[in-house]
Amino acid sequence: FGLQGGPAALDPVNLVGDQSVIAGMTRALKPGCRLLLAAFSSYFQITHADGDLSEFDLMTGTRHEVTGIKDPTGYEIAADLWTTCFTPRELWLMAQAAGLEPLTVRSVHSGEDWAADSLDVDHAELLLLARRP
């Protein structure tokens, strides 16, 4: 979640794309079913920035970085990566705005630590559990 693309000139706070994605997820759920959504944590990005927040836009919650991608022959090209990060409160409010009933948000490291049951600044991701009424 939060990987829908770079900054949009017509969406200065970077909400429209993510709101439309979560609205689509809501429509795909049958009533009574649950949504489990993983998103990157703004708190983690800020806490672990090593003093350099130049690549993190505080207004949009978006981190920009450039990486190299190699084709099958080994030729490398530069590629921009834009990652939107969220606070637990933002995820909760976005779920409510999409018509979901948020149940919990917790801090996790995908593939490593799904047992966490609280929020902290040391896990890279947030996990939202919500239900479609």
Predicted regions and their residues:
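Short, contiguous strand/loop micro-motifs
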Residues: 9-12, 77-79
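A short glycine-rich, Lys/Arg-flanked "PGG" loop and its adjoining helix->strand segment in the class I
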Residues: 14-34
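SAM-dependent methyltransferase
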Residues: 32-94
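N-terminal/domain-start alpha-helical segments
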Residues: 1-8
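Aromatic-acidic/polar surface patches that form glycan- and anion
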Residues: 14, 84, 119-120
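Residue-level signal for short segments within beta-strands and strand-turn junctions
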Residues: 2, 71, 131-132
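C-terminal lobe and adjacent flexible extensions of AdoMet/dcAdoMet transferase-like proteins
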Residues: 88-133
